[in-house]
Amino acid sequence: MREIVHVQGGQCGNQIGAKFWEVISDEHGVDPTGTYHGDSDLQLERINVYYNEATGGRYVPRAVLMDLEPGTMDSVRAGPYGQLFRPDNFIFGQSGAGNNWAKGHYTEGAELIDSVLDVVRKEAEGCDCLQGFQITHSMGGGTGSGMGTLLIAKVREEYPDRMMCTYSVFPSPKVSDTVVEPYNATLSVHQLVENADEVMVIDNEALYDICFRTLKLTTPTYGDLNHLVSACISGVTCCLRFPGQLNSDLRKLAVNLIPFPRLHFFMIGFVPLTSRGSQQYRALTVPELTQQMFDAKNMMCAADPRHGRYLTASALFRGRMSTKEVDEQMLNVQNKNSSYFVEWIPNNIKASVCDIPPKGLKMSATFIGNSTAIQEMFKRVSEQFTAMFRRKAFLHWYTGEGMDEMEFTEAESNMNDLVSEYQQYQDATAEEEGEGDEEEAEGEAAA
């Protein structure tokens, strides 16, 4: 049944991944040793989407863990669910990528990539009907961005018809880990535009804001941030894992969300987000969930959907609720806020309903939006990129690994093209029938 192979790369990817497996194992009643302790057959019915059943009834994640230094992997192995993973699926180097995309993509990462691909292949062969791959990684570092995109390109080559879904942590506007983030991120976007099917854009600052403002956590840890992301990843694939009234899977999502092949960068959100103290006082209704879901404060990336328009959106509900009510609410949102949806795609919200809510909640919803406002993220990175690239600052770290300046220029213009494509569709109206083609032709000539 529709399995998904999960790959986590680099420090950020491995930390998000580790948290994700905690959340999923909890949902399926799998304890840290891989033994099932659940209370419902539904947990086991499609557990094989993410788990392999090994001898003695142990459930082993279909996960591949990669990094260019052993540190993060050691802490995953020592973490609460570290013994769950198959030991051969930890692949790590010793050198580290030193936040250098070129090291991850061309030198250090390229040396390790074949052993990673062997494990990915082995996991894929263990599937009945592989649906696709999901990858958690960051865009600002060296391993997750450089080696992550290298792996995506290689897997794409070998499995061209399987879905490739990434959860990519973009550099944040205010908090920066490394000076060369704009370089690494731009080079990665360049790759993701070509090789990924769906990119869920996440950034730490938006996650901090959610923890701080909505969840009222005074000092949010990365664990708290990663928990938010895990809730989303779990929501996206919940329809594959539990029975539902309106199903969706990675491919249906893609078909419904991507009007033009390059525009596959999505904003994600999860509701209900309530602080730990006030959880028990809130009875949730479908209208409340829907209203919260489209709230800009709940978006997990620092782009404001009110500054753009939704091309498409998808709402994945979980819990016992009437589908009629869900449909009404979706229509209601589109009618009330019609200016925020492009009018040349009628009914552009896809909804799905899965009967089993996540642990501790009566109902929840995951939101995935394809909004033109995402261009804010790319613009911001692009400006920082240009500022440094104009002076050729830090370039020697990349050229020293055998990269060419040309590749930087290409990545920069590809990202700027992406921004103007989003802008073009934000401004497009249903009336301009014949004009669109001429505009595009001019645009290509200009590019």
Curated annotation (Swiss-Prot):
One of the record's GO cellular component terms: cytoplasm
InterPro entries from the UniProt entry: Beta-tubulin_BS, Beta_tubulin, Tub_FtsZ_C, Tubulin, Tubulin/FtsZ-like_C, Tubulin/FtsZ_2-layer-sand-dom, Tubulin/FtsZ_GTPase_sf, Tubulin_C
Positions with biased composition (Acidic residues): 429-447
Record-stated family: Belongs to the tubulin family.
The entry's keywords: Cytoplasm, Cytoskeleton, GTP-binding, Magnesium, Metal-binding, Microtubule, Nucleotide-binding
Protein name as it appears in the record: Tubulin beta-1 chain
The organism's place on the tree of life at top rank: Eukaryota
GO molecular-function term, one example from the UniProt record: structural constituent of cytoskeleton
Residues involved in Mg(2+) binding: E69
GO biological process, one term: microtubule-based process
Database matches in SMART domains: Tubulin, Tubulin_C
PROSITE patterns named in the record: TUBULIN, TUBULIN_B_AUTOREG
Annotated stretches, region: Disordered: 424-447
CDD domains, A to Z: beta_tubulin
PANTHER family in the cross-refs: TUBULIN
One Pfam match: Tubulin_C
Gene transcribed to yield this protein: TUBB1
